[in-house]
Amino acid sequence: PIVREMPEIFRPERVVIRRRDGLRAELHAGFPTYRTSWQRVRKALTGLDVRDGAPLIDEVPRGEAEAPVLELYLPTALQVRQWAELLQWRTASLRNGSILVDRVIVTLGERAAVYLSGPPGFNLFVADLPEAERTALATHVERLDPGLFRPYRELILDDLAVTAEPGVVVPDVAELPAAQVDVSMPDLWEEEVRYFPDVTLVRQIDEQDARSLTDGRRVLRVTGAGLLQYRTAEGSGEAAAPTLEQALETAGRWVGSRGGWPQDVVLHRYVREAGVGRLAFEVHTGVRYPVQSLPGAIQVHVSAADRVVYFERSPTVVNVSFEGEPLPLISPEAALAHALPAAPVLAAEPVRSMYLTYLLKPPAEAGARWTAEPTWVIQAGHTEV
């Protein structure tokens, strides 16, 4: 669904729940159980009294053997102080507030606690979890459908020039069903009135693989694959790029008035350079299986003058069905070996996580269908491969 207001772009891409028996459930954005689980976890994390935390620690405790553990894989790395503001943590003086973190770990044993983790190898203790919140989360985990929990295994890296952080495991699965994707393609003439204040000045430019409209100051382009691109000549000169908060406020209003946001979008990256703040978003969806876009499925560039100077949007995913024949999967070790030559970070940084998803890909030729293929996603350091 498309929504006018910017959705909850900082919610976790996935929530991993490790049960007492060692089995794991991996809940991705779009899953019905994800929504209820995230609501409960967010309630437990909101308003924590972190005092003068968060101190650095050597490693995050893996939790007691008989107690569940929750891991929240956040969509982007933000500073500790930014997550503290988003979750309304109570603190008089936050230590290590500038460290980048992208993961929250909640242990639910006798000493239930909240931790943060981020590349390259930073781990922080946040606070003890109050007993009421610990009980509520533990009860929620106990009541989850047992069918959500699957076996996982450790990576076998003996013959690879790759290392992994302690505790990294992968789903023990050999095949997944083929997927079929339906997307909503943009109509250039319907989009025209959203991007040009005076349509009488607009003329069309035909390209081999795209169609464009321009009024001399702005260009709106739709490619054969359905990618919509908007650019304006307005720049920001030598002024400083906007802060993340300023860029999000401007982007939220601008995109909301020009067709709206996919409901399942999350923030993937924010870069400030040359007087422009560049926001890149991903789409994470799916019901039976996780489905996600390539990074930058939506891009919004905001100038220092709080104007959107570039916008890019992939077609909206309407439906993904999984009725095809089972597809054999390559092993995670084979995926690492395949990725290593093109991603030297895998040899320099330990693997922090590895998971399976259906990756949305544009067609190779105009008029062909978008596809969603089972793909191993590898995270090492700040990089996803």
Question: Where are the regions that the model predicts?
Answer:
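A generic structural signal for short, solvent-exposed coil/turn residues
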Residues: 98, 106, 273, 292, ...
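Short helix-loop boundary/capping segments
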Residues: 303-333
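Short, non-transmembrane alpha-helical segments in secretory-pathway proteins
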Residues: 34, 41-45, 49, 53, ...
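Preferential activation on post-signal-peptide N-terminal prodomains/segments
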Residues: 1-245
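A short, polar/proline- and glycine-enriched secondary-structure boundary/capping micro-motif
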Residues: 124-128, 290-292, 318-326
